[in-house]
């Protein structure tokens, strides 16, 4: 509740709330994604795994730059395991492997949501048009490997929704790089 009060009366939030941008939604997605992941770490039940995965997927749908949650989750997981002072090395390793597997499940749930939403958008999008559009727009992208992966994903009907999502991530990365 205290966090909500600070968020609601934050000068940054108040100053930018009149603008229609995705930054406020991204802040909410980042905040909820972090909270639900920490809740999962505290109590790694299947219910918390599901909710953390669902919130992670929604965050990915809110704004492409929230892909930053992936390294954040890895960092939080490592810190969580390393700060368990009552565990020896082999116990920490076991806890890490168990939580890492469940964290991968969280990612899988989130990306299944992303796949299903982007599947709707690519359903009637001709494959050759998607390929040509992606190739043209990303022709100035610095490194070829991510673009090549994206173009390869477009060629498979099942992975085309992921390709469209990754296309957005690459466009954000390209724009941020200048």
Outline where the language-model segments fall:
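Multi-pass, polyprenyl lipid-linked donor-dependent membrane glycosyltransferases
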Residues: 1-9, 13-32, 46-50, 62-69
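Generic, well-ordered alpha-helical scaffold segments in large soluble proteins
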Residues: 8, 27, 31, 40, ...
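Membrane-interface transmembrane helices that cradle and orient dolichyl/undecaprenyl
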Residues: 33-48, 83
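Short hydrophobic alpha-helices at membrane interfaces in multi-pass membrane enzymes
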Residues: 41-57, 96
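Transmembrane-lumen/periplasm boundary regions of multi-pass, lipid-linked membrane glycan transferases
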Residues: 58, 71, 77-94, 98-178
């Amino acid at each position: 509740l205290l966090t909500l009060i600070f968020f609601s009366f934050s000068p940054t939030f108040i100053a930018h709330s009149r603008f229609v941008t995705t930054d406020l939604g991204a802040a909410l997605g980042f905040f909820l994604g972090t909270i639900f992941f920490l809740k999962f770490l505290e109590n790694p039940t299947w219910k918390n795994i599901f909710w953390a995965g669902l919130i992670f997927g929604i965050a990915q749908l809110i704004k492409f730059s929230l892909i930053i949650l992936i390294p954040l989750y890895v960092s939080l997981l490592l810190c969580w395991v390393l700060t368990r002072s009552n565990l020896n090395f082999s116990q920490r390793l076991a806890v890490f492997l168990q939580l890492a597997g469940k964290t991968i499940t969280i990612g899988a749930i989130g990306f299944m949501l992303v796949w299903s939403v982007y599947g709707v958008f690519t359903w009637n999008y001709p494959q050759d048009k998607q390929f040509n559009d992606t190739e043209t727009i990303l022709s100035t992208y610095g490194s070829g490997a991510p673009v090549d992966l994206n173009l390869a994903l477009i060629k498979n009907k099942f992975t085309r929704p992921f390709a469209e999502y990754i296309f957005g991530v690459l466009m954000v990365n390209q724009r941020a790089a200048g």
